[in-house]
C-alpha cells in the first residue's frame, strides 16, 4: 500500500510546522493583548443546523458524514457558526461584551478538478454582545495589529458596509434571482457582469447608475463622502455615519494607515449585516482573511446578540510572508550535549530546567560533537563532564555557573521582544 494523503490534504514537516507555530503564537498574542479569550469547538456540527443557519453558500462546501446513530453531521467549513452556537448555548446569560478567539482547522469540499486544499488553519476573533462604531473599529484594529505581528511588511485592510449595496438592491425592486446574481457578481469582482445586471430591463436608471458608481468607490475618508453623494438617497446614511465614526477611531488608534475604504467588498457568506472587512497582500490574488458584522446570526439560535469578527488564513499568511521575503524567526536547538551518559543526563536536565532547548547525544568525542551540533543547528555544544559550553560558531566558552539564559531569550531581550 502506498503511503499517500487524501486529495486536498497534506503533511507539514518540521521547519514549516515550526514557522506556522511562530506565526500562530504572534497572532494569538495580539488577540490576548486585546483581552480576547481562546475557546475550542468540536470539529463537527449538525448538518441541519449548518444548512438552516448559514444557508447553501456554506453548507454546500461542507464535508458530510453519518454517525452510528444515523445523524447527518458536517466537518466545520468555517468558524463563525460554531462560535455563534457556543455563545448561544453557553454564554447567552452573560452580561457585557464577550471577546472570543480561536486557532482551528476548517474543512471545505471542492470538486476534484479544482486542485485546492480542503483543510485550512484559521486564526480569528469574535466580539459578541456589543455593536456600534467602537466595536467595528476594535475588530479592524485587532486585524491590523495581528497582520503587523506576523512580520508582513505590505498589506492592506479593506473596509466597507454591505448595507449600501443592499439598500440599492432594495430600491431596484427587482426579482430575488436578479439580486442574488448581482451580489454574486459583486463578490467575484466581475464588473462586466455586474454592470450588465444593473442595466437590465426594469432596473431604474438612477439606481443602476448608483450601483455602478458605488462598487468602484475606494480610498480614505473621502470615499465615504463619495458614497453618500452616489447612494445617500436610498436610506443608507446611518450605515455610512457608523463607518465614518469607525474611521475616526481607526485614525485615533494609529491603524488607518493600513486601512482602505472599499465599497466593492462583499463577503461570500450571506449572514453579514453591516461592516465588511478583508485583508490583502500584494500579488496574492486571494484575501488573507476577512469578516464583518453579523448581528442576526445568533438570533437563529434563540439568543439575539450583535456580533462582529474576522478569520485569517494561516496558509495564505505564510505564502505572503514568503513572497515578501520575510524570514520567520524560529528558535532551534540551543545546545547539543554528549559525553559520559550520566554527566550528559545531569547537564541536560539542568539546562532544560533553565529554559534551554537541549538535544542529548550518545557521541563522546569532541570533534564528533562539534560536527553533530553543527548538523543540528545548535548554538552551543559540550560534553557532559566539561565545565562550560562551547559556541559552535567560534569556539567561545560559556560557564554553567551561574546558569546562563538560553541564547534565544538573551537575543530577544536585546531586541526588546520575542517573536
Question: Residues of each region from the PLM?
Answer:
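Extended alpha-helical scaffolds
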Residues: 150-154, 162-165
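A structural signal for short, well-ordered beta-strand segments and their strand-loop junctions
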Residues: 38-40, 102, 156-159, 260
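Short, structured secondary-structure boundary patches
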Residues: 51-65, 176-180, 280-282, 376-385
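Beta-rich nucleic-acid/ligand-interaction surfaces
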Residues: 41-59, 160-170, 265-273, 367-371
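Short, solvent-exposed helix-helix connector turns and helix-capping sites enriched
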Residues: 161, 189-193, 220
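Acidic, His- and aromatic-enriched active-site or binding-groove loops in soluble protein domains
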Residues: 61-67, 173-198, 203, 255
Amino acid at each position: 500500500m502506498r503511503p499517500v494523503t487524501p486529495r486536498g490534504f497534506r503533511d507539514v514537516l518540521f521547519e514549516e510546522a515550526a514557522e506556522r507555530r511562530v506565526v500562530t503564537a504572534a497572532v494569538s498574542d495580539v488577540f490576548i493583548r486585546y483581552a480576547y479569550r481562546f475557546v475550542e469547538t468540536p470539529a463537527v456540527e449538525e448538518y441541519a443546523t449548518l444548512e438552516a443557519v448559514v444557508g447553501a453558500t456554506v453548507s454546500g462546501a461542507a464535508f458530510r458524514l453519518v454517525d452510528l446513530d444515523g445523524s447527518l453531521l458536517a466537518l466545520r467549513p468555517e468558524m463563525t457558526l460554531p462560535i455563534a452556537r457556543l455563545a448561544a448555548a453557553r454564554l447567552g446569560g452573560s452580561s457585557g461584551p464577550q471577546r472570543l478567539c480561536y486557532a482551528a482547522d476548517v474543512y471545505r469540499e471542492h470538486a476534484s478538478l479544482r486542485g485546492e486544499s480542503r483543510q485550512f488553519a484559521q486564526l480569528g476573533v469574535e466580539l459578541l454582545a456589543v455593536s456600534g462604531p467602537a466595536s467595528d473599529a476594535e475588530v479592524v484594529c485587532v486585524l491590523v495589529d495581528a497582520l503587523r505581528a506576523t512580520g508582513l511588511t505590505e498589506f492592506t485592510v479593506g473596509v466597507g458596509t454591505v448595507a449600501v449595496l443592499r439598500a440599492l438592491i432594495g430600491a431596484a425592486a427587482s426579482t430575488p434571482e436578479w439580486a442574488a446574481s448581482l451580489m454574486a457578481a459583486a463578490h467575484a469582482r466581475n464588473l462586466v457582469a455586474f454592470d450588465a445586471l444593473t442595466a437590465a430591463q426594469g432596473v431604474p436608471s438612477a439606481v443602476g447608475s448608483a450601483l455602478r458608481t458605488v462598487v468602484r468607490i475606494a480610498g480614505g475618508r473621502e470615499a465615504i463622502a463619495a458614497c453618500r453623494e452616489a447612494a445617500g438617497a436610498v436610506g443608507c446614511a446611518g450605515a455610512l455615519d457608523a463607518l465614518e465614526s469607525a474611521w475616526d477611531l481607526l485614525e485615533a488608534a494609529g491603524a488607518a494607515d493600513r486601512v482602505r475604504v472599499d465599497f466593492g467588498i462583499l463577503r461570500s457568506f450571506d449572514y453579514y449585516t453591516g461592516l465588511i472587512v478583508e485583508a490583502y497582500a500584494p500579488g496574492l490574488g486571494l484575501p488573507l482573511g476577512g469578516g464583518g458584522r453579523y448581528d442576526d446570526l445568533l438570533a437563529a439560535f434563540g439568543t439575539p446578540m450583535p456580533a462582529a469578527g474576522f478569520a485569517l488564513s494561516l496558509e495564505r499568511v505564510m505564502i505572503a510572508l514568503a513572497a515578501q521575503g520575510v524570514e520567520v524567526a524560529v528558535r532551534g536547538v540551543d545546545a547539543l550535549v554528549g559525553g559520559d551518559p550520566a554527566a550528559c543526563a545531569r547537564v541536560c536536565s539542568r539546562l532544560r530546567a533553565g529554559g534551554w532547548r537541549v538535544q542529548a547525544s550518545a557521541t563522546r568525542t569532541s570533534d564528533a560533537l562539534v560536527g553533530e551540533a553543527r548538523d543540528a543547528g545548535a548554538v552551543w555544544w559540550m560534553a557532559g563532564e566539561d565545565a562550560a559550553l562551547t559556541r559552535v560558531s567560534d569556539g567561545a566558552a560559556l560557564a554553567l555557573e551561574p546558569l546562563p539564559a538560553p541564547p534565544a531569550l538573551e537575543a530577544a531581550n536585546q531586541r526588546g521582544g520575542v517573536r
